């Protein structure tokens, strides 16, 4: 992978639409986010591609080099450009008036006056970002990129009105070599580390898209997405043998789902409810278990609703993790010439990167963990529209200690809570919280518990389809669905013995397929059940 520092110097005002919400005093604002104005990587990459397209058409050759650099339909190119931000403090936006043109006559339309807020000209404004290549560029590719850089002198909208005059500079950034085996803190035995990944760019973590022109984003990072990003990073770095070490064999490295906000963040258990008027959440897992184990019944609280999203342990207790989202507008590309297609707009919901951290648990052998850390150190790119400046994650830290107490301590706290409700033999019970999808049906789930002499005595779970193939192939729901993260299963040992060993085995092994991608992961007696337990006698 090669990195370039890219600097864009405007010589006139800039207006890049479709990214920022319009100000109350204008019809449209140039691209900006919660921090500052910016140049989206997609806008700059589109301008470079347009210049390169003119060059290869004029020369009559080089179309293959153009495709390798900028990509084509369903194939990602070698170049990606992140958002560019001002180097110095930028002045306030200035208001600029313009009229709309009639498409038929190309004349000014009557009574169609617009006001846009654009960057101020003449203040020495500069934008800086990073251009990366997924592989070393050939001599022809470097020549085409350099020629396109020199030819690109306009950017954004209103170029026919004198806006968007720019100059672009590129400077290669040296990448320090990685010394394998020099990572401290990783045990010599198989274990688990937690990668702390900070978002450097907006994220579009898509779900199965509906038929509309709006693509929404979920609020957490799949283990499969991180696993794929690690594989792509190892390939960029040229460590092809490491792919088999990390991802192949009988015991590949396992990547868990990453929730934002805090190291303790987990998907909201389906037993967790929050007051409609606001306040601390309440969890029903202990009460449900006590009722099933012969304890005192607890009536249902009123004025509560099911909690959703991710929850993390804050100083004042368990709180919902809030992330900032925004909608951006994008245009589809014409496959013939690569230019924006007329009338084909779509909206993307993205997650703002500022202050956003993901904590990714990775389990494997020491050699696997070292390769994973090396790949993460070269930046990971996840989610959709990565080539348009979305999805870059930077490794901030590697944690080797679990945020959870030992299972023995968690199980003892669970027992102590059940005793307050007069539950019979509380040591034989436990709760299993799914922190990843569980891809088994009800019968296979019960058999998995039976192998450890456990039986399901209660639970709150939900199943959902996990792919677009279900509708296309008309698969039965029990085949193409899974238990969603947050499903809670309350179990009891069938022989009247302590459930501690059985819970430990399930927590270590998981249930069902897909463990390398974060599927099948469960946590026994999670602290959120006890911390949010509120006794209610009705």
Which residues does each predicted region cover?
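Conserved active-site/ligand-binding neighborhood in enzyme cores
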Residues: 1-538
């Amino acid at each position: 992978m090669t990195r370039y520092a890219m600097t864009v110097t405007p010589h006139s005002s800039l207006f890049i639409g479709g990214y920022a919400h319009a100000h109350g005093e204008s019809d449209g604002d140039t691209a900006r986010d919660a921090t500052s104005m910016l140049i989206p990587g997609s806008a700059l990459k589109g301008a470079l591609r347009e210049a390169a397209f003119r060059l290869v058409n004029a020369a009559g050759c080089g179309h293959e080099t153009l495709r390798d650099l900028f990509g084509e339909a369903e194939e990602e190119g070698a170049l990606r450009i992140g958002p560019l931000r001002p180097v110095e403090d930028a002045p306030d936006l200035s208001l600029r008036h313009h009229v709309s043109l009639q498409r038929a006559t190309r004349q000014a339309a009557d009574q169609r006056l617009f006001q846009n807020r654009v960057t101020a000209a003449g203040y020495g404004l500069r934008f800086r970002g990073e251009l990366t290549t997924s592989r070393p560029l050939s001599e022809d590719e470097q020549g085409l990129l350099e020629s396109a850089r020199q030819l690109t002198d306009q950017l954004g909208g209103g170029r026919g009105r004198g806006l968007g005059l720019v100059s672009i500079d590129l400077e290669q950034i040296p990448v320090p070599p990685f010394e394998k085996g020099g990572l401290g803190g990783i045990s010599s035995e198989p274990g688990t580390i937690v990668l702390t990944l900070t978002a450097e760019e907006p994220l579009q973590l898509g779900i199965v898209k509906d038929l509309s022109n709006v693509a929404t984003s979920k609020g957490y990072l799949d283990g499969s997405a991180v696993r794929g990003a690690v594989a792509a990073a190892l390939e960029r770095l040229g460590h092809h043998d490491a792919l088999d070490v990390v991802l192949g064999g009988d015991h590949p490295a396992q990547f868990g789902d990453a929730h934002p906000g805090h190291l303790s963040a987990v998907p909201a258990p389906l037993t967790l409810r929050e007051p409609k008027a606001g306040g601390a959440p309440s969890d029903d897992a202990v009460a449900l278990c006590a009722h099933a184990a012969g304890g005192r019944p607890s009536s249902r609280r009123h004025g509560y609703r099911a909690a959703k999203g991710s929850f993390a342990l804050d100083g004042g207790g368990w709180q919902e993790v809030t992330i900032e989202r925004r909608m951006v507008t994008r245009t589809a590309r014409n496959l013939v010439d690569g230019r924006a297609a007329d009338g084909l707009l779509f909206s993307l919901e993205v997650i703002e990167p500022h202050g956003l951290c993901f904590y990714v648990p990775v389990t494997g052998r020491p050699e696997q963990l070292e390769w994973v850390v090396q790949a993460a150190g070269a930046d990971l790119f996840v989610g959709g529209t990565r080539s348009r400046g979305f999805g870059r994650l930077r490794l901030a830290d590697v944690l080797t200690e679990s945020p959870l107490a030992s299972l023995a301590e968690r199980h003892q706290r669970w027992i102590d809570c059940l005793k307050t409700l007069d539950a019979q033999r509380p040591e034989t019970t436990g709760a299993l919280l799914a922190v990843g999808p569980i891809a088994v049906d009800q019968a296979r789930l019960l058999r998995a518990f039976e192998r450890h002499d456990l039986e399901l005595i209660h639970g709150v779970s939900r199943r959902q389809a996990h792919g677009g193939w279900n509708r296309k192939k008309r698969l039965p729901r029990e085949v193409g669905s899974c238990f969603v993260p947050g499903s809670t299963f309350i179990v009891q040992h069938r022989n009247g013995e302590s459930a501690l060993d059985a819970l430990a085995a399930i927590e270590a092994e998981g249930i069902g397929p897909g463990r390398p991608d974060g599927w099948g992961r469960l946590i026994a007696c999670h602290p959120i059940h006890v911390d949010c337990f509120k006794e209610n006698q009705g």
